Amino acid sequence: MVKRSDKVGEEIHKIISELLIKGLKDPRIGFLTITGVKMTPDLRQATVYFTVHGSDEDKKNSEAGLNSAKGYIRKEIGQALKMRFVPEVLFKYDTSLDYGQHIESILKEIGATDDGEQS
């Protein structure tokens, strides 16, 4: 069974993705990807996870740009979803991709040492 919070989260994901393509003109927002949206059970808060392709400074600038556009994004969500309460939007950098790359580099390092021992 699919929860309502999951459905609303998916819709918010679509809305924000479309806004990034068409509506947001903030130059601080770099090349970013929305990786997921997690809703609270009462649908009052949406945590939007994103990744940025670039340096740490690009990550900070993109997060600042997203936070400055919070009001506009929330207004657009409210118009699209027509819910009684429009969820508060929080933006968080998704560290799972960085963590995955770190694990992958460790596994490659282990594989390289195993190959060296077998020779």
Swiss-Prot record:
Any single Gene Ontology cellular-component annotation: cytosol
InterPro entries: KH_dom-like_a/b, RbfA, RbfA_dom_sf, Ribosome-bd_factorA_CS
Pfam families the record matches: RBFA
Single GO MF annotation: ribosomal small subunit binding
GO BP of this protein: maturation of SSU-rRNA
Highest taxon, organism lineage: Bacteria
Subcellular localization, as worded in the UniProt entry: Cytoplasm
Keywords per UniProt: Cytoplasm, Ribosome biogenesis
Matching HAMAP family: RbfA (MF_00003)
Family: Belongs to the RbfA family.
Biological function: One of several proteins that assist in the late maturation steps of the functional core of the 30S ribosomal subunit. Associates with free 30S ribosomal subunits (but not with 30S subunits that are part of 70S ribosomes or polysomes). Required for efficient processing of 16S rRNA. May interact with the 5'-terminal helix region of 16S rRNA.
Quaternary assembly: Monomer. Binds 30S ribosomal subunits, but not 50S ribosomal subunits or 70S ribosomes.
Protein name as it appears in the record: Ribosome-binding factor A
